[in-house]
Design a protein with these regions (language model features):
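Ferredoxin-reductase
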Residues: 1-82, 138-140, 164
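FNR/FR-type flavoprotein reductase catalytic core
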Residues: 70-164
Length: 164
C-alpha cells in the first residue's frame, strides 16, 4: 500500500484545454480513488496545491486546474510526457451506492463543477440516474467546462444549465 503522505511522480498522459485558465490534466495513477477525493500536486521550489479529482479511469485520474497562482502557473508549464509530484488521494470521497434510493440533487458552478464531475458521472451510469437532478452554472459561455459531458448528462439526468 502506498503512503499518501509521500509524493510520487505521475506522468501527464493528456491535457485538455477548456478555457484560457482551466485545463484538465490526465495523470497516470494506478491506485484506488473515489469521486470527491483530492490530491496535493507539488512543483519543487514553488509549493503544492490541493486539486480535486474531476475524473477517474483505468490507470489515470483527471485533475481540472485553474491557473491562479505560483504553483498552478508552474503546473501549466508542463506537457504530455512530463511528470508532476502528487500526494494522496485525500478525503473520504463519496460512496455512490448510497444514492440508489431516493432523489439526489447536485448543485455546482464554475470550477466548482470539477470536484463533483466524478460524482455526476457515477450517478449518470447508475440506477439512480432517473432520480438525479443536476443544476450547473457558469459565468458566460466562454467559461463553460466539460461541454461534451454536459451534452451527455442532459440525456441521462435531469440537468438544468444556467449561464449568466
Amino acid at each position: 500500500m502506498n503512503n499518501p503522505y509521500i509524493p510520487f511522480a505521475s506522468r501527464i498522459l493528456d491535457v485538455k484545454k477548456h478555457t484560457q485558465k482551466e485545463y484538465t490534466f490526465r495523470m497516470e495513477y494506478h491506485g484506488e480513488v473515489k469521486p470527491g477525493q483530492f490530491f496535493e500536486v507539488s512543483v519543487p521550489k514553488f509549493g503544492e496545491a490541493p486539486i480535486s479529482v474531476s475524473g477517474i479511469g483505468d490507470g489515470y485520474v483527471e485533475l481540472t486546474i485553474r491557473r491562479v497562482g505560483r504553483v498552478t502557473n508552474e503546473v501549466f508549464e508542463n506537457y504530455v510526457g512530463d511528470s508532476l509530484l502528487m500526494r494522496g488521494p485525500y478525503g473520504n470521497g463519496f460512496d455512490i451506492s448510497i444514492f440508489d434510493h431516493g432523489e439526489t440533487l447536485v448543485v455546482a458552478g464554475g470550477t466548482g463543477v470539477s470536484p463533483v464531475r466524478g460524482v455526476i458521472e457515477a450517478l449518470a451510469a447508475s440506477p439512480a440516474a432517473a432520480d438525479t437532478h443536476v443544476i450547473v452554472g457558469f459565468r458566460s459561455p466562454a467559461d463553460m467546462l466539460f461541454r461534451p459531458d454536459l451534452e451527455e448528462w442532459k440525456d441521462k439526468l435531469d440537468l438544468v444549465l444556467t449561464v449568466d
